[in-house]
C-alpha cells in the first residue's frame, strides 16, 4: 500500500519544493546583484551626453552646444494643473564664449511656444542669420542677440514612440554659419541618438 503512495508523495514534494527552491534561489541571486546607485547612474548619463555634445561642437565647429529637457515645474493655482517647463541640463562652450545654462532653468514652455511648436511639428529650426528679417526666427531673435548668437540650429529630441522630451541647440557666436542639408541631417541623427541617454536620466 505504501508503495502505491510513493509516486503521489514524490509528486507533492516536487510540486511544493520546486517553486520554493526557485524563490529561494531567485532571492539569493537578487541579493548578490549590486543595487543601481541613482547618483552613479545620473553621473554616467551626464558623462555620455557631455561627451556627445563636446563631439558635436568639435565636428560642426559650433561655439556653444547645449541640451534642454522638459520637466514638471509645479502646479497652477487654483486649478492644480501641471506646469510644463524646460531647463538646459547640459552645455559645452568654446573659450571666450558665454554660458547660457544658468539663464535657462525652469522656463515655462509657453514663453517659447512658437519655437517649441516648430520643433514638435518639424523636428528642427535652422536660422543662418538672426539679423536677416526674411528668415523666420520663431520668437528667438532677441534671445539670440542678447546671448551673442549669430546663427542657431535646434533639433527636437524624441523618444522611439515619438514623445518630445527635449532639444539640442548649436549656437554660432563668432561668425554666421550656414549648414547644408547633409550636415543638418547628420546633426538630426546625433539628436535622435541622444534619446536613449536622456530618457534614462
Where would I find each of the regions flagged by the language model?
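Regulatory sensory and allosteric helical modules in signal-transduction proteins
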Residues: 87-147
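Short hydrophobic/aromatic beta-strand element in the GNAT-like acyltransferase core
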Residues: 12-15, 19, 23, 64, ...
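Feature marks short, highly hydrophobic, charge-poor N-terminal signal-anchor/signal peptide-like helices
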Residues: 1-13
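Tryptophan-centric aromatic hotspots in well-structured domains and transmembrane helices
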Residues: 71, 78-102, 111-116, 153, ...
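Well-ordered, non-membrane alpha-helical segments in soluble/globular domains
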Residues: 45-52, 109-113, 185-188
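Juxtadomain coupling helices with adjacent low-complexity linkers
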Residues: 166-201
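A short, aliphatic-rich beta-strand micro-motif
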Residues: 150-159
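Intrinsically disordered, low-complexity terminal regulatory regions
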Residues: 10, 19-95
Amino acid at each position: 500500500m505504501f508503495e502505491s503512495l510513493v509516486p503521489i508523495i514524490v509528486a507533492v514534494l516536487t510540486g511544493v519544493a520546486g517553486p520554493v527552491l526557485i524563490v529561494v534561489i531567485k532571492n539569493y541571486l537578487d541579493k548578490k546583484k549590486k543595487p543601481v546607485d541613482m547618483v552613479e547612474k545620473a553621473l554616467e548619463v551626464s558623462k555620455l551626453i557631455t561627451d556627445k555634445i563636446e563631439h558635436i561642437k568639435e565636428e560642426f565647429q559650433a561655439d556653444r552646444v547645449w541640451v534642454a529637457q522638459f520637466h514638471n515645474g509645479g502646479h497652477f493655482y487654483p486649478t492644480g494643473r501641471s506646469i510644463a517647463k524646460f531647463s538646459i541640463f547640459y552645455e559645452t562652450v568654446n573659450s571666450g564664449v558665454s554660458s547660457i545654462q544658468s539663464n535657462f532653468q525652469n522656463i515655462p514652455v509657453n514663453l517659447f511656444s512658437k519655437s517649441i511648436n516648430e520643433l514638435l511639428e518639424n523636428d528642427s529650426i535652422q536660422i543662418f542669420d538672426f539679423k536677416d528679417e526674411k528668415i523666420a526666427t520663431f520668437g528667438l531673435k532677441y534671445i539670440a542677440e542678447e546671448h551673442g548668437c549669430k546663427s542657431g540650429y535646434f533639433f527636437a529630441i524624441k523618444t522611439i514612440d515619438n514623445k518630445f522630451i527635449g532639444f539640442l541647440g548649436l549656437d554660432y557666436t563668432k561668425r554666421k554659419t550656414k549648414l547644408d542639408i547633409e550636415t543638418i541631417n547628420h546633426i538630426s541623427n546625433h539628436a535622435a541618438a541622444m534619446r536613449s541617454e536622456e530618457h534614462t536620466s
